[in-house]
Amino acid sequence: MKPRIDWIIHGCANGVVCEYFGETENGFLPGACNFHTHGMEKYSHLDFQMTLAYPPQELCRILNTMGLRVQVGERFKNGDMVSGIYEDCDVRLTEFEETGRKVLRIIVPDKHNRFPEDSECETPYQLQSLATEDIWQEGGFRQ
């Protein structure tokens, strides 16, 4: 059976126009965003989230890669180190809350392989340790 993406990715980032309100998003801290899946519950699994403002295509590639791995039976939990996303480093999964539900945030280390809790972790990578509501600035557009 051919793998089929049967979940959605919801992405909010600076510069993105809201289809519903027609306003341009501008409220995230520089280097931060909120891209996350909806639909992993059909596999009895938490959804995934990324808050590092990579290009949308890269964020979707990573989120879909994780979703496809779940679809074929892999299970992930808080604290797991996951290989196969990047050739030169593992990513870490950390449980966070996103709009009232638990998700596994995919944490990418900086170019020196340092994670956010390392005091020398570079900007914007250290922002990945902030709660979802804390990557938002006052005065920005929010639905």
PLM-predicted stretches and their roles:
Residues M1-A32, M40-Q143:
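Acidic, proline/glycine-rich low-complexity IDRs
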Residues T37:
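Histidine-anchored nucleotide/phosphate-binding helix
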